[in-house]
């Protein structure tokens, strides 16, 4: 698969355009925002999840994507997650002065999700707790439950972060996915937040 992309970053903002034979994606973020978003991926439920991610992380986010959704939404969903991971990594820069770690437990009615984020520079995902069959549910007419894990895999790999995501409770497939996105948002918000008491990079190694 051929890819062409360009990234420009200033302060704690970043922008990337990524084009392949399967999709065209633009993502722009501001880590020091207020949760304002402009999302259009042609996958309505995914738009809803990304809007929630922006709102609850306080990361301003613009996402524009088109792709071969007439075949399957998988390519577009994953490529947006890849691009978001890349711009997140870029916007973080050398990670000096951030809190680095974040944790959140978020409910949505009967669903409850717990997320822990480490902006470590080492990509790793631990994802579990979803009820049997969650991956097969079609949510909003296009988004299959299995895509949730794919999104978090792509973000962690390309952002260089560690994420532990565990679904503690849940019955409704929509609620289970949304609780995870909101828990991730709150944990990410805490992890990337500047800590006025931290001087330099929050690692004994001196680099993240």
From Swiss-Prot:
One of its GO terms (molecular function) is imidazoleglycerol-phosphate dehydratase activity. CDD domains: IGPD (cd07914). Pathway: Amino-acid biosynthesis; L-histidine biosynthesis; L-histidine from 5-phospho-alpha-D-ribose 1-diphosphate: step 6/9. It catalyses: D-erythro-1-(imidazol-4-yl)glycerol 3-phosphate = 3-(imidazol-4-yl)-2-oxopropyl phosphate + H2O. It is an enzyme of class 4 (lyase). Keywords: Amino-acid biosynthesis, Cytoplasm, Histidine biosynthesis, Lyase. Its EC number is 4.2.1.19. GO terms for cellular component: cytoplasm. It is found in: Cytoplasm. One of its GO terms (biological process) is L-histidine biosynthetic process. InterPro entries: IGPD_sf (IPR038494), ImidazoleglycerolP_deHydtase (IPR000807), ImidazoleglycerP_deHydtase_CS (IPR020565), Ribosomal_Su5_D2-typ_SF (IPR020568). It holds the Pfam family IGPD. Belongs to the imidazoleglycerol-phosphate dehydratase family. HAMAP family: HisB. NCBIfam families: PRK00951.1-6 (NF002110), PRK00951.2-1 (NF002111), PRK00951.2-4 (NF002114). This is Imidazoleglycerol-phosphate dehydratase. The gene is hisB.
